[in-house]
């Protein structure tokens, strides 16, 4: 019965994606079928093949270690605002967006610029880009972006595609945005595991997001034009840097533009969502529902979908509410709310814990639209209107990808 319900849930998710498609006749059944089978196969390997799980876990730890070096630069500028003392200064609110996330964007962008300069990024694109290119019938740049989401998040993807963004067609751009939203960065995985979320679920969900992001990008936005992206004479900037130092400096300045764009738009989006919640709560108060909010509405709306995915009806409202928190706020807050249910002696079944853990594992939320618009617009202002148009549909597609992994 549970298996049948899960199969029905998969069909429902695919049907929703089909309804969102802008060109239903151009959907490639080969790409969709191969991506779906690959998503299922990766889930099985990660959960039941220990060497595969160990390899990805070590890679995630390595990325986390590299990302941690950005704290050295941040600490030099911000002093004790960054580091272990953050918990003391901010009464436990250690995850400070301005002092952790934004400096990391600058550091990673500078590092990527260096990797382009010495030729490493070109080599990675050719190798990683070929992995899924033929199997899924997609372009090399789409495959490369999808694979790198295991290690880097949506904040860093604009830096990766900067040399190509003006040549990427609309479908490739949509796939890049969707892949970023459907995944979580390897560095974030460690933090969520620290909240009690089983690391094997996080690792499996992270890898399943590669074909999942492609699957749910290619149904709403099928490929209708050939790729114009080439990989000769790769350079991170319009004028190729002449030295190691120039490459790092130009990358850092680009990172600053991306960080500023992300911070500006995210502030606006979070404030707008708070305003919407205030309006909903105010109206709800007239009818005795003063605590009504976007996430609570999503909780009720998504409860039936959670049940179809395999959650018992008694826990469906909780699952829907957590997914609603992820959509309306972010996955960090949702996992924080989920954490008490993961403690020893919890009331949730193992199956329910697994489904919720997978469903929350991704950056797909309304704030991410702001991140995407701000970051991509910073590196390609002329494509900003197009990126803004794709944001909401990419959010829907990435959310469906997360739910399919569950």
Model-derived segments and their meaning:
Residues 68-138:
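Hydrophobic alpha-helical hairpins/lids featuring a short glycine-rich hinge
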């Amino acid at each position: 019965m549970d298996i049948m319900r899960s199969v029905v849930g998969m069909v429902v998710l695919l049907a929703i994606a089909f309804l969102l498609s802008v060109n239903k006749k151009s959907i490639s059944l080969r790409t969709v079928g191969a991506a779906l089978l690959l998503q299922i196969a990766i889930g099985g390997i990660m959960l039941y093949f220990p060497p595969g799980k160990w390899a990805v876990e070590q890679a995630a730890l390595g990325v986390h270690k590299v990302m941690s070096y950005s704290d050295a630069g941040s600490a030099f500028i911000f002093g004790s605002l960054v580091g272990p003392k953050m918990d003391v200064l901010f009464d436990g609110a250690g995850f400070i967006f301005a002092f952790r996330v934004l400096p990391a964007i600058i550091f990673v962008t500078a590092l990527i610029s260096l990797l382009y300069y010495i030729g490493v990024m070109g080599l990675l694109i050719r190798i990683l880009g070929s992995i899924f290119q033929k199997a899924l019938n997609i372009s090399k740049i789409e495959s490369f972006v999808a694979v790198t989401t295991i290690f880097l998040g949506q904040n860093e993807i604009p830096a990766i595609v900067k040399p190509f963004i003006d040549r990427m067609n609309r479908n490739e751009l949509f796939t890049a945005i969707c892949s970023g939203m459907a995944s979580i960065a390897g560095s974030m995985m460690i933090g969520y595991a620290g909240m009690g979320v089983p690391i094997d679920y996080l690792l499996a969900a992270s890898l399943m997001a590669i074909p999942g992001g492609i699957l749910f990008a290619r149904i709403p936005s099928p490929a209708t034009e050939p790729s114009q992206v080439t990989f000769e004479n790769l350079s991170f900037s319009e004028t190729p840097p002449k030295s190691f130092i120039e490459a790092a400096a130009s990358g850092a300045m680009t990172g600053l533009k991306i960080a500023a764009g992300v911070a500006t738009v995210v502030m606006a989006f979070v404030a707008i969502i708070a305003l919407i919640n205030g309006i909903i709560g105010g109206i709800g108060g007239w009818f005795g529902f003063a605590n009504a909010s976007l996430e609570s509405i999503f909780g009720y709306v998504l409860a039936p979908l959670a049940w179809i995915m395999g959650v018992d009806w008694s826990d469906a409202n909780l699952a829907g509410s957590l997914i609603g928190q992820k959509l309306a706020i972010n996955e960090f807050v949702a996992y924080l709310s989920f954490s008490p249910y993961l403690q020893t002696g919890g009331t949730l079944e193992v199956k329910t814990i697994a489904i919720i853990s997978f469903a929350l594992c991704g950056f797909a939320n309304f704030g991410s639209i702001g991140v995407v618009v701000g970051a991509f617009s910073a590196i390609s202002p002329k494509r900003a209107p197009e990126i803004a148009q794709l944001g909401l549909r990419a959010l829907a597609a990435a959310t469906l990808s997360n739910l399919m992994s569950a």
